[in-house]
Amino acid sequence: MISDTSSGIEPTFALVWKKQNILDGKTLNYVNRYFEADARKHGFYSEELMDYLAAGNSLAEVKGIPEWVKNIYITAPEISPDSHVLMQAAFQVSVDSGISKTINFDNSATLEDVENAYMLAWAEKCKGITVYRAG
């Protein structure tokens, strides 16, 4: 969080999220710095938009946002499980050890959905996968 970097291949989980300051108890919006820069530069930044996204809503549902922005700023929950697996597989071919990559499912995912992700990972020669089911 300090340097806004990652050693992994995870896509951004959220463009905006809330965090409570332990010193004064205030809740602050943390905004992806690249998204914020584009929002300000192209005139669609607003605190209302940041609060809307921090509540877990998708940028794809917001009217008035340029399509190119919506196409760039896709978050992990919006990516299909198969695409998560294929992203991991693309890296796995060049790495001898296992790769840490979370396969995100929404709350309605079934046991069969998870099984299909595991089978795709096996077919693509991934060394393992991690599954996260929202909610």
Regions found by a protein language model. Give the residues of each.
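Catalytic alpha/beta core of large soluble enzyme barrels
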Residues: 1-135
